[in-house]
From Swiss-Prot:
Pfam families linked to this entry: PGI
HAMAP family registered for this protein in UniProt: G6P_isomerase (MF_00473)
UniProt xrefs under InterPro entries: G6P_Isomerase (IPR001672), Phosphoglucose_isomerase_CS (IPR018189), SIS_dom_sf (IPR046348), SIS_PGI_1 (IPR035476), SIS_PGI_2 (IPR035482)
Protein name: Glucose-6-phosphate isomerase
């Protein structure tokens, strides 16, 4: 395509949101008009399904649940007055709690104000809050925000050690809808133990963000925690950033949460339009479908040219992959759908994997996230008339052109600046794009059976470990690995048995291994003490 035709294509397919100042450019996706025409009937269906979802239809049939994250930024959309009131009341509670903490009306026993917050959660209870925290971080936040997002003991120690000297002025926000998520429960118990060891009253520092009547809600009530803020059962983890899950840590940090909600609402209105070319989320879904032939055949590379948006790709990994990565479609047919997502930031990635993107296997499409405003501070020129930001913009434009020369497809999403409103809009844009794409490929975007299978396997492993320890405790002589597996009634899981005892031995849990580590089948196991 010559330069004049390419310029015309850019103008023909450019979307611009006047209120938000956001552009979506899909002109470098190499579809033609015939492809768009073929897909239009699918979009008619997708738009109708999205309307039904917003109206309160059961959009998650596997769990028989409504899907209501869009109501969070416009409570007038809620299908019942009770739900509308619940949304409004929850937001008011979040704002009041944060205001009381900032003003010192809610304070620690030994100081006039809290200084830090540890947010404990995993998956959607952490990825969104971390992305927003980094994207909108201010130099002097109302409270310093830290995250425990795994059950890694060393990682937990790292966070707790960092705030050790300020633990007496630290809030702990535990985020879990059920209260039974092992990683989150473990993080909470580890934090609770650290407070206890320092003679601090944990409940006077503890906040729960959880579902009504959950295990965590019961603990918070029984122990007298500072606050319990609700998670709604009609909001899934990966679409929960604009619920209490994301708004509580953001508000405590001092981020303008009403602006985030306003940005999301404005984008929701734009992505509700039943016209492909004037709906930015539909343009993204169209591009994803074209790139992967509706079967996820190409990976989605997310490349934000802004340090503050670096975690956006990690956030999108869950939103896209957990929503779309499904074995079966809504008709119960095996389809193995999904889109793999990865990325970091530009121009850093130009010195990492962009070499392969330009000259290697063309198994991807790329999304550039561009931010027009360089900085808030005084402009500095690294060369006469040239700033660091000019270089950043030049690297983005140059990489986009270099990829196009090699027929590598790309999308560009442009923000005027990184503000609370823009971040809220960006989240809403991709939430809607995922929902529309899910309709195009006929999958349930709002359940995660694969995650549940992994949780069950982990629970089974812990049960097997307890059984192994009990067997060793009742056995006076060392046991061969094979005999131990037989006694545990797990001969088909002998490798798991071996790895359990190896882990226990490495952590000095009383288990000792005898034999050649390079020949696991020769090892003998015993329990000392």
């Amino acid at each position: 395509m010559d330069a004049a035709a390419l310029w015309q294509r850019y103008q023909d397919w450019l979307y611009y949101h006047e209120q938000l100042g956001i552009y979506v450019d899909i002109s470098r996706m190499s579809f033609d008009d015939a492809f768009v025409e073929r897909l239009e009937p699918k979009f008619v269906k997708a738009f109708k399904e999205m309307d039904a979802l917003e109206a309160g239809a059961i959009a998650n049939p596997d769990e028989n649940r409504m899907v209501g994250h869009y109501w969070l930024r416009d409570s007038n959309l809620a299908p019942t007055p009770e739900l509308k009131k619940e949304i409004i009341t929850t937001l008011e509670k979040i704002e009041a709690f944060a205001a009381d903490v900032h003003a010192g009306r809610i304070k620690p026993a030994t100081a006039p104000r809290f200084t830090d917050v540890i947010s404990i959660g995993i998956g959607g209870s952490s990825l969104g809050p971390q992305f927003v925290s980094q994207a909108l971080a201010v130099l002097h936040p109302a409270l310093e925000l830290h995250f425990i997002d795994n059950t890694d003991p060393a990682g937990i120690d790292y966070i707790l050690d960092r705030v050790q000297d300020r633990l007496d002025t630290t809030l702990v926000v535990t985020i879990s809808k059920s209260g039974g998520t092992p990683e989150t429960r473990n993080g909470m118990l580890e934090a609770k133990n650290r407070f206890k060891n320092l003679g601090l009253d944990f409940p006077k520092h503890a906040v729960a963000v959880t579902g009504y009547g959950s295990k965590l809600a019961q603990i918070a009530e029984e122990e007298g925690w500072l606050a319990m803020l609700p998670m709604h059962d009609w909001v899934g983890g990966r679409t929960s950033e604009l619920s209490a899950v994301g708004l509580v840590p953001a508000s405590l940090q001092g981020i303008a949460i009403r602006e985030m909600l306003a940005g999301a609402k404005a984008m929701d209105e734009a992505t509700r339009v039943h016209d492909l070319k004037t709906n930015p989320a539909a343009l993204l879904a169209l591009s994803w479908y074209f790139a992967g032939e509706g079967a996820g055949k190409k990976d989605m590379v997310i490349l934000p040219y802004k340090d503050s948006l670096m975690l956006f790709s990690r956030y999108l990994q869950q939103l896209v992959m957990e929503s779309l990565g499904k074995e079966k479609d809504l008709d119960d047919k095996i389809v193995h759908q999904g889109i793999a997502v990865y990325g970091n930031k530009g121009s850093t990635d130009q010195h990492a994997y962009v070499q392969e993107l330009r000259e290697g296997i063309p198994n991807f499409f790329l999304t550039f996230i561009e931010v027009l405003k360089d900085r808030d501070g005084t402009r500095f020129e690294v060369e006469p008339g040239v700033t660091s930001g000019d270089y950043l913009s030049g690297f983005l434009l140059g990489t986009r052109e270099a990829l196009y020369e090699k027929r590598r497809d790309s999308i560009t999403v442009t923000l005027p600046e990184v503000t609370s409103k823009q971040v809220g809009a960006l989240i809403a844009l991709y939430e809607r794009a995922v929902g529309l794409y899910a309709s195009l490929i006929n999958v349930n975007a709002y359940h995660q059976p694969g995650v549940e299978a992994g949780k069950k396997a982990a629970t089974d492993t812990i049960a097997l470990q307890n059984k192994i320890v009990q067997i060793l405790r009742n056995t006076l002589t060392p046991l061969p690995i094979t005999s131990l597996a037989d006694k545990a009634e797990a001969p088909d899981k002998i490798e798991t048995v071996y790895k359990i005892v190896r882990h226990l031995a490495a952590n000095k849990r009383g288990v000792e291994l005898y034999g050649n580590p390079a020949e696991p089948g020769s090892l003998q196991v015993t329990l000392k003490g």
